[in-house]
């Protein structure tokens, strides 16, 4: 009887150690942010502020790279794309829902393109629309991702498994909320244009653990 109790204790201890050492424990704190990009926003030609976004390149590498490249105007080799988000506008604003942009070809929500061609498939739906600041791909149905995206201003759970979440706002939610509250006209279009005056990539400053190893940059969702 005593031996069985001792064996059960050993098994429980082993499971506990495995749980602590498991990478899934860190994953519970949130997905790894691999890149940081920014938009400098103007409203009616006047500076509104900067939005800094973290991209989840480990979870959705293809989608994150598409956004990073379009934000910088350069591919992974540093070569100019000749197109991207800089100079484009947010064409759709819905209060208590989201702000949408990324159509740099037509500017009205009917255009845009990805770095992989016109459209690319949904990568996965592992990440959810958990609340304000979530960065997700706009689409016209299954596997129709291009360059259009939206930033949530509330939790939008009904979009889970329909739109690919690939990032989160790290700084500048005050700018997002200011954008959310501008006056709009028919079709939810801002009366005065909201434009991305400048965009690019920022370095990630990693923390270092006691062994001198870089700690993955995450945010808790």
Curated annotation (Swiss-Prot):
Residues 38-201 form the PPIase cyclophilin-type domain. The keyword Ribonucleoprotein does not apply. It is an enzyme of class 5 (isomerase). One of its GO terms (cellular component) is endoplasmic reticulum. Keywords: Endoplasmic reticulum, Glycoprotein, Isomerase, Rotamase, Signal. GO terms for molecular function: cyclosporin A binding; peptidyl-prolyl cis-trans isomerase activity. A motif (Prevents secretion from ER) lies at residues 218-221. GO terms for biological process: protein folding. Inhibited by cyclosporin A (CsA). Its main location: endoplasmic reticulum. SUPFAM superfamilies: Cyclophilin-like (SSF50891). It is found in: Endoplasmic reticulum lumen. It catalyses: [protein]-peptidylproline (omega=180) = [protein]-peptidylproline (omega=0). PROSITE patterns: CSA_PPIASE_1, CSA_PPIASE_2. CDD domains: cyclophilin_ABH_like. Its EC number is 5.2.1.8. Glycans are attached at residue 145. Residues 1-27 form the signal peptide. PPIases accelerate the folding of proteins. It catalyzes the cis-trans isomerization of proline imidic peptide bonds in oligopeptides. Belongs to the cyclophilin-type PPIase family. PPIase B subfamily. This is Peptidyl-prolyl cis-trans isomerase B. It comes from Cryptococcus neoformans var. neoformans serotype D (strain JEC21 / ATCC MYA-565) (Filobasidiella neoformans). The gene is CPR2.
